[in-house]
Amino acid sequence: MAGKFSFSNFFGMTEDEDYSTDLQGTKTTDEVSPTSRPDNIISMTAAGNAKMNKIVLCEPRIYSDAKKVGKHLLENKAVIVNFTRIEGAQASRIIDFLTGTVFAINGEIQRVGEQIFLCTPPNYEIDGNLSDIIDQNDFDSEVN
C-alpha cells in the first residue's frame, strides 16, 4: 500500500495536511485476557434471576383501602385503581392520598378511564395518553 492516503487527493482537491492519514503503522490488535470479560456481557444466571415487575388491580370500597394501594406503590408495583364501587367523595379523597403518595416516591398517576387511574412507581414509564386515543376514535367514528 502507499505510505499516505489523502482525502483531498482522492476527491481531486488540493493537498490539505489536516485530512491526510498515515496508513502504515496503524495496525493494532486488541488482545483480551482469558480472565477478563467485556462489560456488555452478562451472566445467564444473573439474567434468569431478574425480578418481574407487577401490576396490581384494586377496587377500593372504603377510604382505608387507599393504604393498601400505597403499600403496593412502595413495593415498586404499579397499581390500576378502579373507583366504580365507591362514592365520589370517597374516591376523591383516595385520589388525593394517592397523588401525594406518588409525588413522594417520584412516581406518576394518570387517568386511564372514567373512574380508573394508573399509579406507577418511578421504575415504570407511562408512554402515551389514553384520552388522545379515545378522542381520535371518537373523531374517526364521527367522520365515517
Swiss-Prot record:
Protein localization: Cytoplasm
Pfam family, one: SepF
Record-linked InterPro entries: Cell_div_SepF, Cell_div_SepF/SepF-rel, SepF-like_sf
Keyword field contains Nucleus: no
Bias (Polar residues) ranges: 21-38
GO cellular component, one term: cytoplasm
Region (Disordered): 21-40
Any one of the GO BP annotations: FtsZ-dependent cytokinesis
Record has Cytoplasm as a keyword: yes
Keywords for this protein: Cell cycle, Cell division, Cytoplasm, Septation
Biological role: Cell division protein that is part of the divisome complex and is recruited early to the Z-ring. Probably stimulates Z-ring formation, perhaps through the cross-linking of FtsZ protofilaments. Its function overlaps with FtsA.
Family to which the UniProt record says this protein belongs: Belongs to the SepF family.
Assembly with partners or alone: Homodimer. Interacts with FtsZ.
Protein name listed in UniProt: Cell division protein SepF
Organism encoding this protein: Latilactobacillus sakei subsp. sakei (strain 23K)
Highest classification ranks of the organism: Bacteria, Bacillati, Bacillota, Bacilli, Lactobacillales
